[in-house]
Amino acid sequence: MSGGKYVDSEGHLYTVPIREQGNIYKPNNKAMADELSEKQVYDAHTKEIDLVNRDPKHLNDDVVKIDFEDVIAEPEGTHSFDGIWKASFTTFTVTKYWFYRLLSALFGIPMALIWGIYFAILSFLHIWAVVPCIKSFLIEIQCISRVYSIYIHTVCDPLFEAIGKIFSNVRIGLQKEI
């Protein structure tokens, strides 16, 4: 029981402690234990990849989705023989398919290695150089901002307040002449 109320044999009203066990980090019932065990740690290095949908975030939808109809088209009145058109379609499709596979077999792993190194360097520089430089700059600029704030409050504020008071009594009257 959590947070309930009960009456003892003498008629005194008591509340049940919210947690009867001492350790707040361990679940006190089976439902909580099951809930915690369902949460799995996500590890990017051991996740399974989808071999069917290889572009789940649709990065290349508008770039490399090139089919035969996107490249070669014959307008009305200018048609080649049907056999030539079918052979051209098959040649284009099969060539594109197998040449892509050949290129990815030859250069896929080296390019993955190069891009992996590049993004590792980029992540390293961002974590260990860029962010600390920005934080350092923000800390150092605070000193300058205080001096600038003092300058504004001691010089510019009174000056512009005086100029404002000078021009506050200026009145412009417009008359329409007929």
UniProtKB/Swiss-Prot annotation:
Residue ranges of the region described as Interacts with SPRY1, SPRY2, SPRY3 and SPRY4: 131-142, 167-178
Residues with the Phosphotyrosine modification: Y6, Y14, Y25
Sequence segments annotated as region (Required for homooligomerization): 2-94
Keywords: Acetylation, Cell membrane, Golgi apparatus, Isopeptide bond, Lipoprotein, Membrane, Palmitate, Phosphoprotein, Ubl conjugation
Main location: Golgi
Chain residue ranges for the region called Interacts with SPRY1, SPRY2, and SPRY4: 149-160
GO biological process: caveola assembly; cell differentiation; negative regulation of endothelial cell proliferation; receptor internalization; regulation of cytosolic calcium ion concentration; T cell costimulation
Entry-annotated residues carrying N6-acetyllysine: K5
Cytoplasmic side: 2-104, 126-178
Lipidation (S-palmitoyl cysteine): C133, C143, C156
Ranges within the bilayer without spanning: 105-125
GO molecular function, one term: molecular adaptor activity
Modification N-acetylserine occurs at: S2
Cross-link (Glycyl lysine isopeptide (Lys-Gly) (interchain with G-Cter in ubiquitin)): K5, K26, K30, K39, K47, K57
GO cellular component, one term: Golgi membrane
Subcellular location field: Golgi apparatus membrane; Cell membrane; Membrane, Caveola; Membrane raft
Keyword Lipoprotein appears in the UniProt entry: yes
Domain of life: Eukaryota
Post-translational modification (record): Phosphorylated at Tyr-14 by ABL1 in response to oxidative stress. Ubiquitinated. Undergo monoubiquitination and multi- and/or polyubiquitination. Monoubiquitination of N-terminal lysines promotes integration in a ternary complex with UBXN6 and VCP which promotes oligomeric CAV1 targeting to lysosomes for degradation. Ubiquitinated by ZNRF1; leading to degradation and modulation of the TLR4-mediated immune response.
Topology versus the membrane: Peripheral membrane protein
Region Interaction with CAVIN3, annotated ranges: 82-94
PANTHER family: CAVEOLIN (PTHR10844), CAVEOLIN-1 (PTHR10844:SF18)
Family indicated by similarity: Belongs to the caveolin family.
Subunit organization: Homooligomer. Interacts with GLIPR2. Interacts with NOSTRIN. Interacts with SNAP25 and STX1A. Interacts (via the N-terminus) with DPP4; the interaction is direct. Interacts with CTNNB1, CDH1 and JUP. Interacts with PACSIN2; this interaction induces membrane tubulation. Interacts with SLC7A9. Interacts with BMX and BTK. Interacts with TGFBR1. Interacts with CAVIN3 (via leucine-zipper domain) in a cholesterol-sensitive manner. Interacts with CAVIN1. Interacts with EHD2 in a cholesterol-dependent manner.
Protein name according to UniProt: Caveolin-1
Gene source species: Saimiri boliviensis boliviensis (Bolivian squirrel monkey)
